Amino acid sequence: MDTRRLILVLIFTFSSFMLWENWQKYNQPKPADAVAAAPVSGAAPTPSAALQAKAAPGTPPVATPVSTAETFSITTDLLKATISAQGGDLVSLELLNYKEHDDIQKNFDLFDAKHQYLAQAGLIGEGLPTHRTTFKHVGGATKLADGTDELKVRLESADQNGIKVAKILTFKRGSYLIDIAWEVANGSDKAIAPHAYYQLQRDDLAPAGETKMVSTFTGPAVFTDADKYQKVTFEHIADNKAKFTKTADNGWLAMVQHYFVSAWVPKDKTQREFYMRKVEGSNVFQAGVIVPVAEIAPGAKGEASVSLYAGPQMQSALKQVAPGLDLVVDYGWLTVVAAPIFWALEAIHKLVGNWGWAIVVLTIMIKAVFFPLSAASYKSMAKMKMLTPRLAQLKERFGDDKQRLNQEMMKLYQTEKVNPLGGCLPILVQIPVFIALYWVLLGAVEMRGAPWILWIKDLASADPYYILPVIMMVSMFVQTKLNPTPPDPIQAKVMMMMPLIFGFMFFWFPAGLVLYWVVNNVLSIAQQWQITRLIDAGGKAANDAKA
């Protein structure tokens, strides 16, 4: 296989990878065993008979419309949360350390009203408050004070049949975790056994900044110890074909999007039931978890609490929140390669303090690891380049006899001790590393808003002036000049077009990925030029000796 075929193989492999990833996203196979998810109107969910035990859920009360409900804000060192009096819903959650994709003057709002994205919670049981019930904020601070580590927000609903209910949200310093707790005081004359539900609501539209060239998964996901990480598409929920674990005594439920995640994390060994559903007549979906509250005798109090993580997909933080939560940073089928690459990138960043330079250093390290393979490849290419005139002569002599031409070419390769596959195999070995690095740079929230130098203000966004893609095209053009020229004029023209095709594709790729490619190309050019120069010098010396 000569150089032109090698490059064509690389292009075909990369293109196939991109097509496969997008095919998986839009054409996932139909699951055999589906969990029913009938359209709903936004009412409280109903637990299954197995989870209900003695509970008898009733009809939720009529709520104040969202448009007329009052709101108030809570501010910590990391968050600015807006809470609605209706249900005590989290209707806005600004992440103070992250900016909007299309307006860096604004904080990124995870619970974005444009996507009808919010976190809701309620109780299931006759007369008990749901996410449609009006609550009252019972005083207290709305800003985390200096020197304090947590801020509690207490909401109370109107008494129903002697039952008093309070919803307490606890915000913590330096954390994206919010504890959502229920206090139920049973002043009635009979025991009650309510359930608490916690759900995330969102439409099916991709977040701002997503393109088909660099699209990632958006939708709900479930994790349990038994069945591990399970992504569920909005399409499968809408078609009643969603497949996921429904009951367990461990695990969490999340709503995933590029760079960020919100997840309900009940306490371990608490029996729970996961559900997903489409709100009737809309493109809005709800995914949640139901947990039982212990039976509350007359005159007694009961409590239930679940943690909500709502923030960036920082792997180190996610691992501490719950087992498997770091899997929302999805590297696909190359996780075994991508995970150590990210670990190395993070370690380098701690030393150099800049993610752009960390990418440069990591590229040099990867190039050093593959140096022997690359050297073997470039030596083979250089020898093939020296044989180009003789191969052209053979083609001119035996062009009409393909079998004889191939025989003569193989004789030439054997005589000159050249392996035509030598330039291909070493580079093919590196393809999984490149694809894994692609997913690392695409999925790492650390790259979002991270500057490099001068005009590169965000390594997760495309180069605004297309300087890096142009440099990449130039570097690829130089590489084609260092490679053997195809004897076929048409193939030669195709090879000359490849830098333009690749460069055009990379106009929309994250700058961090293009930076890796540029640095890799520059190092490859230097290595290939040096090897070619040495081989040319050796060949010339051998010819002089023969003369």
From Swiss-Prot:
**Keywords recorded for this protein, A-Z:** Cell inner membrane, Cell membrane, Chaperone, Membrane, Protein transport, Transmembrane, Transmembrane helix, Transport
In the bilayer, the protein is annotated as: Multi-pass membrane protein
Entry's Gene Ontology molecular function annotations: membrane insertase activity
Where, subcellularly, is it found? Cell inner membrane
> Where is the chain membrane-spanning?
6-26, 328-348, 351-371, 425-445, 459-479, 499-519
User: Quick check: keyword DNA repair in the entry?
Assistant: no
Listed GO biological process terms = protein insertion into membrane; protein transport
Q: Which InterPro entries match?
A: Membr_insert_YidC (IPR019998), Membr_insert_YidC_N (IPR028053), YidC/ALB3/OXA1/COX18 (IPR001708), YidC/Oxa/ALB_C (IPR028055), YidC_ALB_C (IPR047196), YidC_periplasmic_sf (IPR038221)
Question: What GO terms fall under cellular component here?
Answer: plasma membrane
One matching Pfam family is YidC_periplas
Source organism superkingdom: Bacteria
Q: Membrane among the record's keywords?
A: yes
Family assignment from sequence similarity: Belongs to the OXA1/ALB3/YidC family. Type 1 subfamily.
Functional summary from the UniProt entry: Required for the insertion and/or proper folding and/or complex formation of integral membrane proteins into the membrane. Involved in integration of membrane proteins that insert both dependently and independently of the Sec translocase complex, as well as at least some lipoproteins. Aids folding of multispanning membrane proteins.
Q: How does it assemble?
A: Interacts with the Sec translocase complex via SecD. Specifically interacts with transmembrane segments of nascent integral membrane proteins during membrane integration.
Q: What is this protein called?
A: Membrane protein insertase YidC
Gene (UniProt): yidC
